[in-house]
Amino acid sequence: MNEKSLRIYVSSGPLDMHEMLSDALVKLGFDSWTEKENRDLNQADVIIFISDTVGLNLLERYNLVGSRRPIVILWLVDPLPPLDLSERASRYALSASKVNWQYLCGNVLGRFVHKYVPFARELRSIIRSVYLRRLAKEMTLRNPAYGDCPTREWGRVVRRYRLFIDYMNQGLIDYVFTTTVAKKEFIINLGFHAEFIPFGYHSIFGQLQGHKRDIDVLFLGRLNNERRRRVIDRLFDELQANGVELMVIERDYYSQGRTELLNRTKIMLNLLRVPWDFGPERFLMSMSCGALVVSEKIMKPELYQPGVHFAQAETTELASIICQYLKNDSEREKITHCAYKFVTGELQLEKNVSQLLKRCHLSDT
């Protein structure tokens, strides 16, 4: 089959990343689509799952198994557990992820138990939280930095971890790529192959519009865990004491509305969901709109260089570094200019997608 005649379906991901990826594939000459186009999935020669493994159940739903299964590529954006996950912590993690009636009893009986058996949901939550607390305690003993990771985030991470192992052991994933080295190292440590390719810039993330920057500091995201809310509350008070306003927007903000908002923003605050990994989304959307990213300290920022592409500090020092960059326009603009050139030039999505397909032996370009 001619490489350019490949039909590639892109499964849903966060922040329209699936639309960006599909558009990049079309620009590279491939026939690509997302669920929005309502095309028959059986037409696909390749399926790319962006973000995590949760969506892989559609292979079973559409009976895309055996000889009918297309090539499956996983491009992991969301975090997996840290590399130093101990054997005991791994047992707690997998036990917590399996506290699910459908997993324990099968889909049909599990749904019945979950829906109709009194206190089934409450019992599941109690058992699961016990395992998650044990996991958190074990990992905090290994690294005190993990102590701030909320139980909610541990829950998401361990579900992702269990699904990944299940699908890999079933042979349902042909190629694995990660957007950070931390995830790649964890997967290799499990005995599977993975390669690091960062997610790249697409115009949907944003563009420079030349607006007056009248928003000092912006945090864009959900305050759906206790730690994040605690950090925001403290920062709000510290910045207000210095005459700086922190704007927090929790609702979804997409496309042009988000781009306009970021073009009015001087500093975009990045708070980590987990201490050992980070997502690329805030970096790409902020840098492409000329806003300075000020982040909690990232263990492995990789391609993004602190002091060159963004600023970082310990959580307790965030207010201080924010005030420093607000007072020094030239220093802030030096970093935002460098960051803009980096993401819109070197980190183009089409370039990274082409590299990904080449490593899957699906493209020679």
Where are these regions (language model features)?
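Nucleotide-sugar donor-binding catalytic core of glycosyltransferases
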Residues: 2-44, 49-307
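Short, hydrophobic/aromatic alpha-helical segments in well-folded domains
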Residues: 172, 282, 321, 338-339
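A charged, aromatic-enriched C-terminal amphipathic alpha-helix characteristic of glycosyltransferases
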Residues: 326-360
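Generic C-terminal helix-cap and adjacent flexible tail
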Residues: 361-365
